Amino acid sequence: MSEETAAIRVLSLDDYDQLTALWQCAGLHSVRPQGRDSRAALARQLQSGVQTILGLEIEGQLIGAVVATHDSRKGWINRLVVDPAHRRQGHATRLIAAAEQALRDQGMQIIAALIETDNPGSLALFRQAGYVEFDEGIHYVSKRDSRDV
């Protein structure tokens, strides 16, 4: 299947089962289905107005997705996944561009992504998309109420 037959659309709560199956298929290990990624949590996130989930479909099958969020000053690209059977065809690049546009449409002029150190492929992809690694003594820290959040 060619990239031309792939369509990007905004996902809704109706797409929850397909989305979580894609996350699992793609090996996204940070998914918390009992917490921050539960159906109820996703409903709250989508209703907040600061999160957009975009999906890439081929013939009705969800083969890629990305979450675009913002805090009103900076946009974030999260959870970029492509089904392993459809990788290396430009789909992730298209999803990044679509997420960037969604964030710009909401007024974001800074767009960032956090990339795990054991994912050099993702880092290379974002570099290719024009992102610059910001390595000036910044550390990511978080405080979580539970492992599922």
Predicted regions and their residues:
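Acetyl-CoA-dependent GNAT
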Residues: 10-78, 96, 102, 133-137, ...
